[in-house]
Amino acid sequence: MKYEMVIGKDFRYNVCRKGVEHIIFTDEVAPKEKGVELEDLSNDFDGSVVGWIKDGTYKVSTQTKGQKVIFNEDSSYMFHERIGSYIKSIDFNNIDTSHVTNMRGMFAFCENLEELDLNNFDTSNVIDMNNMFDGCSSLTSLDLRNFNTSNVYKCQLKNVQF
């Protein structure tokens, strides 16, 4: 198993639900209780990455202790607009972004996000960060200290104010 997620746009369509305000990337095992439905979010559709909703939180997990969720090479528009208007927080503690090359529009129009902790992002292979934070009107804190932009050739930030 590769534990790699679907492309960003496909993830966005799976998560788009009213009532989901938080997203957590984890390695915890999904609860086996009535009303909790698992969605296969793995790129190979092998169940290595699954998602479920519980109490307004969408959890994305490998269900394997110590195994991080590997973001797809194309993670563009992952949290863009369609879900962005609902999401208040995203916990990126259990992720691997080392294979990502495209982060275009990743957080664009996440209107309710106030802060983003992206310290766990490995951006060393990213070439496109264009409009990554476009329209994030509530964003007041954004820590990009660990961003390696040496390979980025597209990075336009418009309508972003800090």
What are the residue ranges of the model-derived segments?
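Negatively charged
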Residues: 1-162
